[in-house]
Amino acid sequence: MSKANTLVEILGSTYKIACPPEEADAVKNAAVYLNNKLLEVKESSGLDEKKAAIITALNITNEYLKNLSN
């Protein structure tokens, strides 16, 4: 399976993600979702980027696990 580089932007930084071409849109959508969640946490809490990333990861994991139970 071939991989292509997909560029995403999260908190003002650009990342090059290697993924199969057919998954590029999903990766971009995930990055937009993550960026929005990070901004929500940063703006509402005033936390630095590292702490906001940890809280955001915990929140997203909690959402994911709740959805698995349903």
Regions found by a protein language model. Name each.
Residues 24, 48-51:
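Compositionally biased, non-globular sequence tracts
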Residues 30-46, 53-65:
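Compact, glycine-rich, soluble single-domain proteins
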